[in-house]
Every structure is written in C-alpha cells, then in structure tokens.
Amino acid sequence: MWHFAALRRHLSKENAVNGQLNLSASPATPATASRSKILMMAIIAGAVITNIYCTQPILPLIAADMDVNLATVDLVAGAALLGFAVGLALLLPLGDRFDRRKLVLGQIIGAFLFAAAAALAPGIWALIAASFGLGIVSCVPQQLVPFAAVMSLPGDRGRSVGTVVSGIMVGILLGRTISGVVGSAYGWRAVYGVEAAFMIPVWIAAAMLLPRGVPSTNLSYGRLLASLWPLARDHRPIRESMIVQALLWACFNAFWVNLAALLANGPWHLGSAWAGGFGIIGAAGALAASLGGRATDKRGPRSVVAASIGIVTAAFLLLAGAESSLALLVIGVIVLDIGVQSGLVSNQTRAFAVDPKAQGRINSLYMTATFSGGALGVVISGWLMTRYGWSGIVIFGIVLGLVAALVHWSGKPRREDVFSR
C-alpha cells in the first residue's frame, strides 16, 4: 500500500526536489473512515472499474458473433477507455464542488443502464456507443480516491488511499478473469448482463456506506473546468506525471487488449477463459507493486517513476518471446503490472503534492491523461496487431517506454513548484 505518513506538511528543500508533500484533507471534511469502511470503498471501486475492462478478454467472441475484424472490435474497448477519460475530465472536478456521495450513487445507476444497453446491443456500433457511455459513468473509483483521503486521519491517509487504489487495480485485473470465464461459458452478452446486475448491490453498499461529502471549493462548474488548464500549465510535476503515465497506460492496455487474440491464434489456440485467467497473474504483480509506494516515501517519486519506466520497457523485451514461450508471457505479465502500478502510485503522488486542496481537479487532469493514453494505445495497437502481429505490439511498447524515459529525464531534478498555502 501507499505509505504517505512519511510525507510532511512542510518540506525540506531536498524533499521538495523529489516532490514529496502530505496529502492533506480539506479542513472542512471530517476524518470519519474506519478501516472497514475504507476496505468497502476499495471493493466498490474495484467492482465499478470492471465495467471498463470486462470487454478485453471477450473481444474475439464479439468479433466472431458480429462478424467484424480485430481492428473494429478493439474500438469497443477503446470507446470504454475514452469514455472513462471524458468522465474523468467532466465529472471528477465536481467532487471538489458538490457532495461526492450523490455523484457516486448517480454514476452507479448510469453504469447499470449502460451495461444493460451493451448486453442488448443489436450491432457493433450500438455496442461501441454503449461502451462509451459506460466508460463515462464508471469513473466512480477516482471519485473514491480523494474521498478516502479526506475521510481519514493524517496518519492513516496514505494507507487509506493505497487500499482504494489497490482495490482498483485488483478489480481491473480480476475483472478480466471473471469476464473470460463467464464469456467462455455463456457468451459475451452475459458478461455485460452480469455487470449490470452487479451494480445493484454495489449501489446499495455505497448508499449505506458513504457519508455526505463536504465541498472544498465554491467555484462554479465552469470555473472548475477553467481552472484545470492553469494547474497543468503552471506546474511541471503535474504535466510530466500526466504525460509519463499516459504513455505507461498505453503500454498496459496495448498488451491486455491484444492478449486474447495472441492466445486464440497459433500456436496456443486458447479461449477467452485463458485470457481472463491471466488477470490473476497480473493481480499478483499489482499487489507486489505496493513496494513501489514504500519506495516513493523513502526515495521520492521521481526516482520511482524512472524505475517504473525501466521495468515496463523490460517487460516488453520479455514479452517479445511470448509467441513461443508461456513462461515468458507469465513473467512478462507480472513485470508489466509491477511497473505500471508503481508508476501510477509515484506519478500520482507527485501530482497530488502540488495542491492538496485541489485533489479532485488534479486527479481529473492526471487520470484523464492516463486513460486517454490508454484509449489511444488500444486503437493504435489494434491496427498494429492486425497489420504486424505480436511483433508490432512489442515494438510499440518498447517505443512508448523510451519516449516516457525521454520525457522524464528531459527536465533536470530541481525543487518542485509546491502550491503556496
């Protein structure tokens, strides 16, 4: 888990260079969360995020049922990620202005409706549209991350945020497993049906668990959105974190969205259940990457970001042999998820440090960039897979890793521009 307790409110010059700062709650928000509540928030976050990633293991099933090629069916997964990015940009800033509890409950209802629409979609373009809508309303997990922070005491805040983020990552990866098994047994429409049905107990749990959120700003919605660009423009740590994590997330999704096609074709000829099963392996890697949070506290986020970029790039070097070796595929999955999760933790820590009172807006910028990168990664990698096969995916991942390294090292380490309070 993340351990932000080591990050102090007032930084020494050395720590400022590494971008360390305490994630402070809004002073108006009471710290009321028990560990059991935070754990339930993590479960809710993990359950909702599966709406975005449940499609990936069943893409070959959708392609076969609707008689479309891989490049076209990949748009279903890409639409979900793009919709998620839109939701992050337009809905997440509202958490600084309005009651987050009402936002979360409304979005879960929307997720139920769009998942049901996807299950009943008559054609590929209707499915793409439903997937886009499902993505927009499924940004609930990123509403819960700052919610967990402001509900916790300062000494527990890092653990609370880390618990919710770990729930998100486990939901992403295990959601693929469940999707693969259900899709293999009952067809791809059943996957969306299960997602829709699951939103009912999730809504009930959220309604019972979440307290009323206290706004941290009185800015109008228009001014909230207008304040996003200056945050990115004026603060280099936010800009760099956005770009680097967008590139790493593009790598992450380029692999996962094409894994089912790799396994379905020669030499493996394995079905969607196998593709989903790799989610368990990836979840192990994501849990192991909690060490990255500890390293962020000790060494500062910049050094951990650099290590994460190297790990992700190394993962694609291992995955180059995935067409002929399941062992390399398994190892590559674990290494990839460790690298991406460590990057997510360290980049987000660095961005949040700029202004703790604008966590909703910073999170909106950061996660919008992240999932926009993921959506582009899906679309581009689908074309590469169709044209060049698995080699195209591997080269794509390595190139993105090198670009991320260039962005990260283009600016010399110096005192971070910490928000003046």
Regions found by a protein language model. Name each.
Residues 302-347:
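C-terminal transmembrane helical hairpin of 12-TM major facilitator-type secondary transporters
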Residues 88-99, 288-301, 385:
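Helix-to-loop junctions at the C-terminal end of transmembrane segments
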Residues 140-152, 342-355:
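Intracellular juxtamembrane helix-capping segments at the cytosolic ends
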Residues 130-168:
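Cytoplasmic helix-loop-helix junction between adjacent transmembrane helices
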Residues 86-124:
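Conserved MFS/SLC helix-loop-helix module at the cytosolic interface between two early adjacent transmembrane helices
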Residues 23-32, 211-242:
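Juxtamembrane intracellular "pre-TM" segments in multi-pass secondary transporters
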Residues 162-210:
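Helix-loop-helix hairpin linking two adjacent transmembrane segments in secondary transporters
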